[in-house]
Amino acid sequence: MVRKFDFLVIGSGIAGMSFALKVAHKGTVALICKAGLEEANTYFAQGGIASVTNLAVDNFDKHIEDTMIAGDWISDRAAVEKVVRNAPGQISELIKWGVNFDKKDNGEFDLHKEGGHSEFRILHHKDNTGAEIQESLIEAVKQHPNITVFTNFFAVEIITQHHLGIIVTRYTPGIKCYGAYVLNENTGEVDTFLSKVTIMATGGCEAVYRNTTNPLVATGDGIAMVYRAKGAVKDMEFIQSHPTALYHPGDRPCFLITEAMRGYGGVLRTMDGKEFMQKYDPRLSLAPRDIVARAIDNEMKQRGDEHVYLDVTHKDPEETKKHFPNIYKKCLSIGIDITKDYIPVAPAAHYLCGGIKVDLDGQSSIRRLYAIGECSCTGLHGGNRLASNSLIEAVVYADAAAKHALSVLERYDFNEDIPEWNDEGTISNEERVLITQSMKEVNQIMESYVGIVRSNTRLTRAWNRLDILYEETEKLFKSSKATRELCELRNMINVGYLITRQAMERKESRGLHYTIDYPHPQK
């Protein structure tokens, strides 16, 4: 089946839905989501969204400086300034769409402070800010007559000149995107979505790791599709681990214990109750995430422990319950009362700082294709993301991409020559064990060899193991009917390869990339 829309948005988190809402008054929008509208990373973001609002003590320059320091000075300053200066306007837009940020009794925003921030500037809704934003955007999207939502539709490949029989390489100038081939899981058929403009908003790829705070839909689909289409992908080695995921064996994804809990006064302790952050950083438990994650990883490896503890037992119990109701409830469900007991925590893959390379308008290296949100690499985060900068980046770049796309829309038309998906000669694969086992292998490879601390030996081993899986999976893909699981496995292997290759290419330790073979940053 062929479907035509002015805008094809792949992904239904804060980036994709914001973009859809910003362009829908000017054209038809298809919003593709591989599961339900709630199954986005945005929904799981607890901490908040960073924006300079209290001008009595805070200003743009401070937020810019904090972001540059966290990014280990390799952030793109133009991208940093763009996000920071445009943040307040986008906060107003979110409020207009129905997002409720917590306020104090005097009507001012109740701002949090998180690791790496010099001032209180994190707007939040209790400890489930992402869910509040996601639910508000879902309501706005559902009410818009020009937006059609496709749930359980999985994008398999973006369509370029390659599908017209033209040879496309990484050096081909002017590659264009004409839409995407999308698997309709309701029918099992691959539909052709033709568009004037396509927006990749598919989120991160942390489900390639065994321990992750991300929903298991975060398989790097958009990044893999763009890479296969010969688009530019950048900074994939910078995978941020959240230092404090709840340690509860069997949970996947891991439950996230927000950064704000350390900002609130939480203290990290070893399993025998000793504080340890003084050995690593003068900011103690409020040091940036990469330092805290490496410190925890080091303590665990040195001592042979499975986790460390986060302690808020010295804080007022009622205040703790009020600030962190979801964390209190989750921990209580597994027998931990956080007002009396230490919380067992360990690092887990949390956020990708790299992704599809884009310019200040969110344009990728492929024409007519934009990338926004976590799947993109704007240059904002550099070597490490400052806490709560991701949600604001998503809306600022959704706004920039929307403005640019609207300004060029009339130049484009649908390409009617695109052939429909051809799966003649393929068979339905009943051997799901081949796919699930290979997924487990990817998780194990990435966790063991491409984790928080890396080495040339580990990365080479990961490369060799992934290469075997790649050959097996491509063979399976060519002979089988497309299924979501098979496509996800293929994407996970592509993304695992990109993380590993770009980690091998960086001959230094910087930001989130730490290797024992090159322990210092290059000058």
Q: Which residues fall in each region the model found?
A:
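Glycine- and aromatic-enriched mobile tails/lids
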Residues: 1-6, 22, 28, 36-38, ...
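N-terminal Rossmann-like FAD-binding beta1-loop-alpha1 element of flavoenzymes
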Residues: 7-31
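An anion/pyrophosphate-binding glycine-rich loop and adjacent beta-alpha core
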Residues: 225, 231-338, 343, 395, ...
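Conserved N-terminal glycine-rich FAD pyrophosphate-binding loop of Rossmann-like flavoproteins
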Residues: 35-68, 72, 240-243, 251-255
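FAD-site-proximal beta/loop scaffold in flavoenzymes
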Residues: 157-172, 178-187, 336-380
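Rossmann-like flavin
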Residues: 70-110
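Short beta-strand to alpha-helix junction loop
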Residues: 75-88, 121-139, 150, 212-220, ...
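Conserved redox-cofactor binding core of oxidoreductases
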Residues: 96-189, 194, 201, 245-248
